From Swiss-Prot:
<dbReference type="GO" id="GO:0003735">
    <property type="term" value="F:structural constituent of ribosome"/>
</dbReference>
<protein>
    <recommendedName>
        <fullName>Large ribosomal subunit protein uL1</fullName>
    </recommendedName>
</protein>
<dbReference type="InterPro" id="IPR028364">
    <property type="entry name" value="Ribosomal_uL1/biogenesis"/>
</dbReference>
<dbReference type="GO" id="GO:0006417">
    <property type="term" value="P:regulation of translation"/>
</dbReference>
<keyword id="KW-0810">Translation regulation</keyword>
<dbReference type="GO" id="GO:0006412">
    <property type="term" value="P:translation"/>
</dbReference>
<dbReference type="Pfam" id="PF00687">
    <property type="entry name" value="Ribosomal_L1"/>
</dbReference>
<keyword id="KW-0689">Ribosomal protein</keyword>
<comment type="function">
    <text>Protein L1 is also a translational repressor protein, it controls the translation of its operon by binding to its mRNA.</text>
</comment>
<dbReference type="InterPro" id="IPR016095">
    <property type="entry name" value="Ribosomal_uL1_3-a/b-sand"/>
</dbReference>
<dbReference type="InterPro" id="IPR023669">
    <property type="entry name" value="Ribosomal_uL1_arc"/>
</dbReference>
<dbReference type="InterPro" id="IPR023674">
    <property type="entry name" value="Ribosomal_uL1-like"/>
</dbReference>
<dbReference type="GO" id="GO:0019843">
    <property type="term" value="F:rRNA binding"/>
</dbReference>
<keyword id="KW-0694">RNA-binding</keyword>
<comment type="similarity">
    <text>Belongs to the universal ribosomal protein uL1 family.</text>
</comment>
<comment type="function">
    <text>Probably involved in E site tRNA release. Binds directly to 23S rRNA.</text>
</comment>
<dbReference type="GO" id="GO:0000049">
    <property type="term" value="F:tRNA binding"/>
</dbReference>
């Protein structure tokens, strides 16, 4: 899938979508083929840093106490303290809600054993296990990187869709972001993009435009 075909699909996705009174996101949808996804090694569970950013702020939760929790609060991030974490371990419905509402999790390293017991069963299958950091960490560099990161997680289904930007970004920026996802798929499998059956891109409220191979 070369840049020209990706650009063509991005332009088509724009033209197919009606204008809305909000900024629409652009998604990439990829259908895979000839992969046994009952085998965990064939599943895609990757974080990809998009060269031109997500075009949409991710929701980040920080599991911490003391100074690290205070730093996260100052940054406007969701903070989950130890007592709340223990409560989430008893309330699976609330744990799932937290997991679904947040894109990424960061955890104070010495709290990871408790995270594993309480939120692990919910975050693990979603590919959202927290990134551990020391209690004295500066969260800014990590948060800035996560603001440009998307998560691919096929689980056992031969398709995934992932955010690659928004309609305010240029066609070139969106195409570069799509290439970053395709390169990740290519590196994962020995036969590379052969395993991509089809790929589409679409704006939030628009129909999909196929990326020709």
């Amino acid at each position: 899938m070369d840049r020209e075909n990706i650009l063509k699909a991005v332009k088509e996705a724009r033209s197919l979508a009606k204008p809305r009174n909000f900024t629409q996101s652009l998604d990439l949808i990829i259908n895979l083929k000839e992969l046994d996804l009952s085998r965990p090694e064939n599943r895609l569970k990757e974080q990809v840093v998009l060269p031109n950013g997500r075009g949409k702020e991710p929701k980040i939760a920080v599991i911490a106490k003391g100074d690290l929790a205070a730093q996260a609060e100052e940054m406007g991030l969701t903070v989950i303290r130890q007592d709340e974490l223990e409560e989430l371990g008893k309330n699976k419905k609330m744990a799932k809600k937290i997991a679904n509402e947040h894109d990424f999790f960061i955890a104070q390293a010495d709290m990871m054993p408790l995270v594993g017991k309480t939120l692990g069963p919910v975050l693990g299958p979603r590919g959202k296990m927290p990134q551990p950091v020391p209690a004295n960490a500066n969260l800014t560099p990590l948060v800035e990187r996560l603001k440009k990161t998307v998560l691919i997680n096929t689980r056992d289904k031969p398709l995934f869709h992932v955010l690659v930007g928004n309609e305010k970004m240029s066609d070139e920026e969106l195409a570069e972001n799509i290439e970053a996802i395709l390169n990740t798929v290519s590196r994962k499998y020995e036969k590379g993009l052969y395993h991509v059956k089809s790929a589409y891109t679409k704006l939030t409220m628009g129909p999909p435009a196929q990326i020709e191979k």
